[in-house]
Amino acid sequence: MINPIDGRLADLDERLFMPRELSWLSFNARVLQEAANESVPVIQRLRYLGIFSSNLDEFFRVRVAEIRRLITLSTGGKRQRAKELLETIQEQVAHLQQEFDRTQSKVMAELKRRHIYIIDETELSRRQLTYVEDYFAKHVLPALEPILLSDELAIPALADESLYLAVDMKTPEGDKYAVMEVPSDVVGRFVSIPRGRDAQGKVFILLDDVIRACLPRVFRGVFSIESASAYCFKFSRDAELEIETSINESLIEKMASSLKQRRKADAVRFVYDATMPEMLLEQLRKRLGFGRSDSLIPGGRDHNSQECIGLP
């Protein structure tokens, strides 16, 4: 006979329970394990990488944002426990990001073995480069809106979960920095390009690498550029909606107002190319309002892997 448990749930030692945030990270680690499983079809593995990335974005926008609010609003032991939980989350996410990068490299190698090539701008043949430059001029350049970083001008509100390029330019007047959104919602993240003359299969290049290949054209007539490099980054904002209680607005009007305010909500995570120069990273960190102890996560060259789900 099973004895009933005496006492209330509130009386149990909280150390017996795993915080729901860490439990959720364990679940997403399981998704990443599926992406690493070589018995799973390679296209499905790629989609698991996309699911992992999308899940992590939502985790920061909702769960981590909630913990940050708790740290801000609470005091004493409750605040300290929230700070310790946030530190644990940051450590686990950094580990997961490293594992993600390793798994992604293996999946890309397997795609190549099956004659599906995703190349970058450094691997383009002369014929492919000509195609990419023409594609850029017709479809990509009109959709780009570069923003110069200047101490005199405030940076406009950037869209969370969008992919951006941070640009480091060497000019005769000194270093110049800019950011621009990668317009994958307009053009698509994967661009199909011609194969090599003797190659088989399909060849794609990421839209961000199309922009990298043609970077000097973006600023032609603005700067005399000696060299330029671009580094991916993205960030997540607090997803909480604050609904005003005014009786003079309809629910739809209240929701619309709340969604507009969310565009200016606190940023809760910043993921960036680990090779980004320190000066450029510091500029972005300050302008996006991140402290040094916040969730700044170095990663690989490419981000927004949830778009892998839509690989043609």
List PLM regions with ranges.
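N-terminal non-catalytic structural scaffold regions of very large proteins
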Residues: 2-312
